[in-house]
Amino acid sequence: IRGRRVLRVPVRRRGVRPLPVSATGADDVIVVVGMDCRFPGGSSSPEAYWDFLCSGADGVVPVPYDRWDSDVYYDPDVDQPHKTYAYEAGFISGVEYFDNAFFGISESEAGQMDPQQRVMLEVGYGALAAAGLGKERLVGEGVGVFVGCCNDDFKSLAPAGGKAIGVYTATSGDVAILANRISFSLGLKGPSMTINTACSSSLVALDVAMLQLRSGSCRAALVGGVNLLLSVEGFIATSKARMLSPTGRCRTFSVDADGYCRGEGCGAVVLK
């Protein structure tokens, strides 16, 4: 990205034999032809994300007040009911904004859509556009859409009693519709599925997309993943399980590791 060279250092694990190059024919080679992303730290493009990584920053910030009031739910005592000892995470900004007219979606429907659908649609289209596939070229094309997602915070925000249930509720708040929303909005005719395998959802979506490409089920594949932290409930649940880091930092493989830090983000790649 931007002229920087990344050196890949081969690592040989004991007891693991590398796959022979001849095991994959030239016709089976799959390449990334487009990508887009939105990550914490203002990383709204692959180039911005690369610069952010090189800066050494981590993007972890206090919980914004437009999500929930951390002062109400924070307590360092893990045994306190309906409290979380985590008050920081990696958040992306602007999830409330959406260009609904560009995608032919009414304001009333857009207002009831899970923000994860909106962000995934924008980032997914950004990846397709980066691959040279604008809206006019996509209609009717056999492009598959494979989205990994395991978070449905949006449902927990609905008021009790069904008062907010409307004509778009069934499709606008269901995680299963994430991939279908992209396919429908852009007129894509390939396979379309949302995959939930918890933390590995996006990786499994990538694996399924490659299998579908090789089987001929689609000519190209849009693969993405999205995660937005819209409710405090997930923080409370993972705090009770003592999964979260009290210091708000991931220190993987370190003796100082004390849990993990939650984070938002959305990424997409186009495979051919």
Residue ranges and their predicted role:
Residues 1-18:
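Phosphopantetheine-dependent thiolation modules in NRPS/PKS and related acyl-activating systems
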Residues 21-256:
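Cys-dependent condensing catalytic cores that perform Claisen condensation/acyl-transfer
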Residues 85, 255-272:
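Channel- or pocket-lining gating/hinge segments that regulate access to a cavity or pore
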